């Protein structure tokens, strides 16, 4: 069995890490490079940096940040936010990123997934899917950080993403994001059962048991979290020791 991964996520605005609830109400969580360095020392397997503004000016700041992160940490990291074309991918990989996460741009232009996989390899292409459980019981995909509903449903889109060559999927439940009541394990389990690429669980981590459940019930390959790490509620080394004691294959 492949070891499960613990991945802190850093949402970046003006070079600072911020965190919100249900994708709104952001608060400052600290320096993005320093936090990344701390997580690397604590034993994080990977990091994800998301540029949540992604304006033209912010893009320059973000590329400089990616260079600093690459110079200061020794674990793989994924970057996303505002990636719309191959030129953006090229710039960020050249700045030192290991993987690229695309979300809204892939929904608008699915061939971007194939282009990234073909030019840089599937392992570089992470497709982020933000979905919300609707009143009719369906999981609907959203654009622009959870603000704009689409006509795409989660399972249909996830299967298309895999068929177009994505290396893994980062699935965030908007319904669960930031409220710390656990991951969307039922839908995670259905996703992992229907796909052949790794699924990263995101949205809902509040305590150690939530990570355990994401791996055992949700069958996720990795679990991503933000606020529990940023605000010192949970130490990654302590979390990994807990998971290991629960019989979960984890890198120490």
From Swiss-Prot:
Enzyme class: lyase
GO BP terms: L-histidine biosynthetic process
Keywords: Amino-acid biosynthesis, Cytoplasm, Histidine biosynthesis, Lyase
E.C. no: 4.3.2.10
SUPFAM superfamilies xref list: Ribulose-phoshate binding barrel
Pathway terms, separated by semicolons: Amino-acid biosynthesis; L-histidine biosynthesis; L-histidine from 5-phospho-alpha-D-ribose 1-diphosphate: step 5/9
Gene Ontology MF: a single term: lyase activity
Catalytic activity annotation: 5-[(5-phospho-1-deoxy-D-ribulos-1-ylimino)methylamino]-1-(5-phospho-beta-D-ribosyl)imidazole-4-carboxamide + L-glutamine = D-erythro-1-(imidazol-4-yl)glycerol 3-phosphate + 5-amino-1-(5-phospho-beta-D-ribosyl)imidazole-4-carboxamide + L-glutamate + H(+)
InterPro entries (UniProt xref): Aldolase_TIM, His_biosynth, HisF, IGPS_HisA/HisF, RibuloseP-bd_barrel
Top-rank taxon, per record: Bacteria
Subcellular location: Cytoplasm
Active site, UniProt feature: 11, 130
GO annotations of cellular component type: cytoplasm
Assembly with partners or alone: Heterodimer of HisH and HisF.
Role this protein plays: IGPS catalyzes the conversion of PRFAR and glutamine to IGP, AICAR and glutamate. The HisF subunit catalyzes the cyclization activity that produces IGP and AICAR from PRFAR using the ammonia provided by the HisH subunit.
Entry's family note: Belongs to the HisA/HisF family.
Protein name: Imidazole glycerol phosphate synthase subunit HisF
Taxonomic path: Bacteria, Pseudomonadati, Bacteroidota, Bacteroidia, Bacteroidales
């Amino acid at each position: 069995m492949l070891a499960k991964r613990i991945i802190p996520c850093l949402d970046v605005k003006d070079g600072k890490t911020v965190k919100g609830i249900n994708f709104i109400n952001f608060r400052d969580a600290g320096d993005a490079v320093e936090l990344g360095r701390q997580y690397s020392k604590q034993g994080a397997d990977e990091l994800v940096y998301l540029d949540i503004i992604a304006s033209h000016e912010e893009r320059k700041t973000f590329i400089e940040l990616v260079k600093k992160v690459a110079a200061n940490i020794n674990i793989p990291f994924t970057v996303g936010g505002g990636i719309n074309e191959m030129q953006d991918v090229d710039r960020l990989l050249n700045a030192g990123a290991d993987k690229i996460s695309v979300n809204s741009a892939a929904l608008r232009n699915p061939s971007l997934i194939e282009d990234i996989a073909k030019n840089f390899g599937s392992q570089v292409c992470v497709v982020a899917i933000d979905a919300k459980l609707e009143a009719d019981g369906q999981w609907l995909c959203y654009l622009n950080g959870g603000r704009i509903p689409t006509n795409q449903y989660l399972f249909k889109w996830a299967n298309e993403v895999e068929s177009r060559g994505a290396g893994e999927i980062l699935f965030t439940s908007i319904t669960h994001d930031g409220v710390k009541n656990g991951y969307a394990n039922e839908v995670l389990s259905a996703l992992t059962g229907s796909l052949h690429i790794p699924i990263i669980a995101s949205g809902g981590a509040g305590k150690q048991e939530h990570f355990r459940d994401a791996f055992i019930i949700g069958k996720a390959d990795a679990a991503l979290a933000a606020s529990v790490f940023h605000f010192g509620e949970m130490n990654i080394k302590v979390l990994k020791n807990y998971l290991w004691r629960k019989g979960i294959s984890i890198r120490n």
